[in-house]
Amino acid sequence: LYLPGISSAQQPTPMQTEPAQAPAPDDGQAESSSPKAEEVPLDKIRGLVEIFHKIKQDYVEEVSDEQLLEDAMKGMLAGLDPHSNYLDGKAYQGLQDSTSGEFGGLGIEVGVEDGFIKVIAPIDDTPAARAGIQAGDLIIRLDDTPVKGIGLNQAVKKMRGKAGAPIELTIVREGEEKPLTFSIVRDVIKIRSVKSRFLEPGFLYLRVAHFQSRTGEDFRDAIQKRIEENKKPLKGVVLDLRNNPGGVLGAAVAISDAFLDEGKIVYTEGRVKDSKLDFNAKPPDLVAGAPVVVLINEGSASASEIVAGALQDQKRAVIMGRESFGKGSVQTIFPMSNDSALKLTTARYYTPSGRSIQAEGILPDIV
């Protein structure tokens, strides 16, 4: 789940959410309201410098200054939580591409678990989904490279590449005695985040595969188009968020708001002032009170859980399926001056009733 960062860099962060219900943090022009910084531990920094010089002087192989410093930054962030990390220029560009809707690769959202790469969800209509990759799979090898300990950024770099280039994934799957091997051909991933159709006259099915910067607008357009096509009030709506790994906060707020006239959607809390946000619904309810069913599973994470949690707490929808993933933290993207970026967990989000989703997930009303 992404929020814009406060940065001295001139370019805007691509994760700007433009929420209508509450002000988002300023995009690079405001002074940070972070807590007063503690004194810099100079003795520890001296120790870090000593280690740096020892490696440069005595390590068995020559290592560049750039590599050492980048690894130090990655290590600093890796010790915080699985979602905070340093994004070099290539990784940062990849993140921008994924939130804008087109990039080259396999089409899976991944995280880290016990040093391995865990599949949060395959994205609809991508090579990974067609190959049979499932939410919860643990990737243990990419081609001939074991992934344990290589870090999320390196794993993502290896999975992305030119369309047409193959890669072999070795995974461990719950219920399978032996690791499974998948040979997948990379493709240009064009994420169509919103699909819609009528299940039968008056009953609308809406599929949201990912929350991107335009998803909220596309979602509202799809509803309006189908209502005009139906020529009568809708009788019911099915919102399918299964295997939706999340994305941009503003899109989750917009989709929740589409079904609500009023009330809280979500709020975030963190240590700094700018991380504390409230998002509230505004009229109208685009489907005019038609009954709503939301489908979720273990691959529904982050922004998907915001939508499901908001509609469940506001008693606006019945949640069906299986317990969701349980990612209740917010990452802010801070662009750096060298075309890299810092992805840092800055807040946790809570449903209208005050529930934290972190590590617990949304429990469906009907299993």
Pin down the residues of each PLM region.
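Terminal targeting/pro-maturation regions of precursor/exported proteins
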Residues: 2-86, 117
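Cleft-lining beta-strand/loop regions that shape enzyme active-site pockets
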Residues: 39-44, 48, 56-65, 118-121, ...
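PDZ/PDZ-like peptide-tail recognition elements
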Residues: 71, 83-121
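Short acidic, Pro/Gly- and aromatic-enriched capping/linker segments at domain boundaries
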Residues: 336-347
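Conserved functional hotspot residues or short segments at active or partner-binding sites
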Residues: 348, 353-367
